[in-house]
Each structure stands twice: as C-alpha cells, then as structure tokens.
Amino acid sequence: LDELFGEKMDILKKLGIEENNYGACAGPGQWNATTAEGNIDSINPATGELIASVYQCSTDDYESVVQQSLEAFKEWRKVPAPERGQLVRQMGNALRDYKDHLGSLVSLEMGKIKQEGDGEVQEMIDIADFAVGQSRMLYGNTMHSERKDHRMYEQWHPLGIVGVISAFNFPVAVWSWNAFLAAICGNTTIWKPSSTTPLCAIAVQNICNEVLSANDVPNIFSTVIGRGSSVGETMINDSRLPMVSFTGSTRMGRHVSEVVSKRFGKTILELGGNNCIIVDETADMDIVIPAIAFGAVGTAGQRCTSTRRVIVHDSKFEELRDRLVRAYHQVNIGDPLENGTLMGPLVNENAVSDFENAIEKAKSSGGEILYGGSSIDGDGNYVNPTIIKAENKWEIVQEETFAPILYIMTYSDLDEAIEMHNGVPQGLSSAMFTLNMRNAEKFLSSVGSDCGIANINIGTSGAEIGGAFGGEKETGGGRESGSDSWKQYMRRQTNTINWGTELPLAQGIQFDLSE
C-alpha cells in the first residue's frame, strides 16, 4: 500500500483508513469485526489501482447497529434541541480540521478534482452551521379554539432512526444534509454509503466517533457498508426505520419508494436530472460560456445537477458553438489531486461504457459531434468531454447519462424553448441566461420551468444549502436543506388543552348523559 501511494498514505492514515477495514459501526469503539461476508474493494478511478478494502456488513452486524441506534434514540430525543445543535456545531468544527484530508480522499476515491472535493466538505460544514441555527427554530403553531377555555397548538417530535442511502457522486455531503438536520430534530441516523466510495464513509464515521466520544452523548451516527442488494434491501424493508432518504437513479428510486411506502414509511428521493440551460438572444455570452462549461464538465458530468442540454436562440448558436469549443480545448484532464486539473476520470469502467454507448446512440440518431466523442486510452477511466448538436426528442437526449456529454439545440420562439426544456421526464435544475426581464420572469413563472430549481444568469449546478434542493417528476419530489427541511425529519402533533370546568364538544355537538 505504501509503495502504491507514497505521499497519499498520509491522507488515509490521517482519516483512520487501513488496508482492510470493517464495514459496520454503531459509534465510538463499536466497529463490528465481521470478515465472513467478503470484501468491497475501493479502486482509484484515476489509475485503476486498489486503494483499500472494506469487509461487508453482515445481517448480524446490521441488527446490532439498529438495536444500538434505537437505544441511542431513546436518550437523544430527550436532549433539548439547542443542545443537540451544539453537538452538530462541533461536528462542523471537526470537519474544518479534517477538510483538506477528507477533500483529498473524496478526490482520490470518487475522482472529482481536489477543489470540488474540498468544496464538498465545505458543504458539510455549511449544513452543520445551518443546522445549528435551525435547532433554535423548530417552530410550532398556536391557534384559537372554537371552544371556550381551550387552547390548541401544533408541535413537532422526532421520528426515530433515519436511514440514509447515498450515491458515489457526493460521497460525504449528501449524508450530512440529512444527518445533521435529523440530529437537531432528535433522530439517529444509519448510513449506507455507495459501495463504490466506502472509504469516504469510514473516514466520516471516524470523525463522528471522535466528536461523540469527546461529548459523551448517545451514538447517534452509525454506518453499515455493503451491497445494495443485501444491506440496502434490508434497510428499506425495515419498519424500524420510519424514514429513508435515497439518492441515486430513477430506477432504484422507484423501487425504494414502492418498498418503503408499502410499510407506510416516509422517503426523501433525490433521483435523476436532465438539466437544461436556455440561452436567449440577449444573453451575456461572457458568463454563459463558463457557466455551461462548468455545469457540463465539472465532476466529469457526474453531478445530479450537471448541465446536459443547452437550448440556444438561432441568432446565438454559431457564437455559442465556437466559443464553447474553444473553452473545452482549455479543459485540462488528468489526476484529480494535481493542481490545474479541471476534469478527472469517471467513477468506474461501467461509467465509461455508458458514455461510449450514449455517444453511439446520439450519432445513430443523427447527432453531430462538435467536440470530443471518445474515451481516452490508458490507465484510469478518462473520457473526452463531448458536445453534440442534437434534437430534444431523441431517446438518448431524454435519458440521463452520468458523463460529460452536452446536447445543444436551437429555438426561435421562447414558448418553443420552454416546451423543449420541460419536455423530458426529469425535473431537477434549470437555468436561463437573458438580459430581458420579461423573458426571465416568464421562465420563473408557472408557465416556465417545471423544475425544483430555476435560475437566471447562473448555471444549473452549484446549489447553496440555504435553499431547498430537489426536483419534480422522475427526480422524485424530495427536498433537502432549505428553510423548512427539518419538518421532513419530524412528526407533527396537534394538541388541545381544556383548562376550564366544562366539556364542550367541537362543532357544537350535544351529547348529554343522564346520571
């Protein structure tokens, strides 16, 4: 291991990553030492080399983690919410201390460039700060009763164990969006990370363990690592988990929704995106080009909010095409941990195959390759970012391909552009570049974008935690972060107090008993 990574060993050692790691943890000192379920190998997508291995969680391990999480919940729910917020504050501070190393591990294991890896950890810090504030704002409502000498109010209580099933593309941030808000609401969390990025989860759990141990609080953060077909299925079928937050494909999200709803559990679904930018005839091209390039190329097109389609006014097409191609020539592809790299590899060989298949489908439909269009030979899962002139109705354009493929189309009338924009099954993020106020307002109105996120003069990716994140249609309808996101992690209770001497019934009903 030392020979393979040299200076990169410092990243692993700092975060408590060994050559072989256990795959289930219920808190400080609670790593279950099961080895019989086989290994999950973590592969560096930039080189194809083994980073480290993780022993998969067993059924007994899972059961042990759930039982301990249930016991932790019984105590944690009694802790005042502002005090719970102080623990999350310390989690944020610990993440500040580990930001450089954890950001590097995200880059090493997932493949996004170092700046984006650090940015993902910063998202964790930001949501921690946000959750601390929210811990003092879990507001209920009071209302007047129609009955004399009565008072009514609504209050909120924690749910219990929140299950978080996250995807490889944001291997640490998505957990924090859920776990920190769930924690200030009085819940515990069990996390099943992507089996593609298990080391990131182990590192985060180790950081959690440090904070939990230092504060002598219940073990509210737990991790179970294993294949989705085993550990994931167990989680979504487990009625002891009243809430499951799932991030992943639309196909798997539909399955999760069906299984959890059958047991009347709650879900937060963050699924596919087919995000689009409309560029009208008044757009400032000096900000359009970098916005499209970052949206399409950032994280090698593996963000849920990656820009996948551009619909440009006829009069702007040639300028946009030429300037965008020049910009793509400047994208330095290489080791995500090296300074100056703007695009790293795809996460694995399957992702490269999906990229190549999508290119072939687009070409067979009549697509014109304007830039790229091929994978890169050699070590690692590298591809060339690709621009294709296409039509919105093509099957491949209607699908989400998790890769740096950008489809460009033209329009002459804004209503036509909006119809094309909305004419896909997904509805996550959208943007319009314009200096025309009427066009901007129309795009943001009820007859405009049908997405959960709609922007003006800013791209489709790079959402901030202060606003609700999520989408419509096959994106799943879930929302994370934002002003009232805490309500998803709590149950609402209506209370009526009679402080008088009589028992009037609602709606003036009379129910006289003769004694």
What are these regions (language model features)?
Residues 1-46:
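Hydrophobic face of amphipathic alpha-helices that form TPR/SEL1-like repeat modules
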Residues 33-34, 39-40, 56-60, 283:
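A short acidic/small-residue loop/turn micro-motif
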Residues 47-52, 217, 241, 278, ...:
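Conserved C-terminal structural/oligomerization subdomain of aldehyde/semialdehyde dehydrogenase
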Residues 48, 84, 106, 186, ...:
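Residue-level signal for inorganic ion chemistry
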Residues 49-138, 149:
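Glycine-rich loop-to-alpha-helix module at the N-terminal edge of alpha/beta enzyme cores
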Residues 50-57, 71-78, 164, 277-280, ...:
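Short, well-ordered beta-strand elements within core beta-sheets of diverse protein domains
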Residues 140-287, 411:
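Rossmann-like NAD(P) dinucleotide-binding subdomain of oxidoreductase/dehydrogenase enzymes
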Residues 207, 251-392, 414, 419-420, ...:
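ALDH superfamily catalytic-core signature
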